[in-house]
């Protein structure tokens, strides 16, 4: 978890063991428009603010990593989630 801007390439490179030749990343970001499920209305987003109870969030991330590594043949998994105010287009999470 971080309050700083996330560098997607840097995060991916930190978790890749030397024996791996490729990475797969999910890059989540703050989007400009959101569709309301119940009404179908499209609303414009000005910015996002992420908050977390960090001890619990980190514990849940570790559980998620454990589940994924148990189900798939994956060498390593890393998750970085942004906290604080994000402007449109800024990265919110990298997995």
What name fits each language-model region?
Residues 1-91:
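N-terminal, polar/charged subdomain of small-to-medium soluble alpha/beta proteins
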Residues 95:
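Phosphate/diphosphate ligand-binding glycine-rich loop within oxidoreductases
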